[in-house]
Design a protein with these regions (language model features):
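Residue-level preference for beta-strand/loop junctions
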Residues: 17, 31, 79-81, 95, ...
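Hydrophobic beta-strand-centered segment that forms part of the acyl-chain substrate-binding groove
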Residues: 66-105
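Extreme N-terminal tail/first-helix region
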Residues: 1-16
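Residues located in well-ordered beta-strands
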Residues: 24, 86-88, 100-102, 127, ...
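Short structured motifs
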Residues: 19-25, 83-89, 109-111
Length: 150
């Protein structure tokens, strides 16, 4: 099993709230990830579309998976914390959703900063699309990563 496969398997179980909402991590790579959430009553709102909170949960989970992929080789020795997030709801989200997350900038530079400075802060952008391929939200999550404190 590759480090990316292990991350994918672990993240799908590690965050109970994301699991409760039905979020699954579909792909993980170096600084990238894809996640999805099926449309079901538990994630719907008062007008029968995807609830804004479910959209945010999906985006945050995808960003966390992209972060994990960035540090796949030493993730267990790190303490990642989502420090800030912003979301722009672009369209009504209809049906199942997919999130595509990507580290902004150069993944190697992010790793090098952690190595040289002992900590790093960087943004991950996430695009949410619905079943029809319509972009329904744009999200940025700023992460802070430092060594795990024992």
């Amino acid at each position: 099993m590759t480090p990316y496969e292990m991350i994918k398997a672990h993240l799908s179980r590690a965050v109970p709230y994301a699991t409760y909402t039905g979020v699954t991590i579909d792909e993980v790579g170096a600084g990238v990830a894809r996640a999805s959430v099926p449309m079901r009553p538990e994630v719907s709102n008062h007008i029968g579309t995807v609830h804004a909170g479910a959209m945010f949960t999906l985006a945050e989970a995808a960003s966390g998976a992209a972060l994990a992929g960035t540090f796949a080789d030493n993730l267990l020795s790190l303490r990642p914390v989502a420090a800030e997030a912003s979301i722009r709801y672009l369209k009504v989200a209809k049906g199942s959703l997919t999130a595509a997350a990507r580290v902004d900038g150069d993944v190697e530079a992010v790793r090098a900063t952690l190595e040289s400075e002992g900590k790093v802060a960087f943004p991950i952008t996430v695009t949410l699309t619905d079943e029809a391929g319509v972009n329904v939200a744009a999200v940025t999550v700023s992460w802070h990563v430092s060594p795990l404190r024992v």
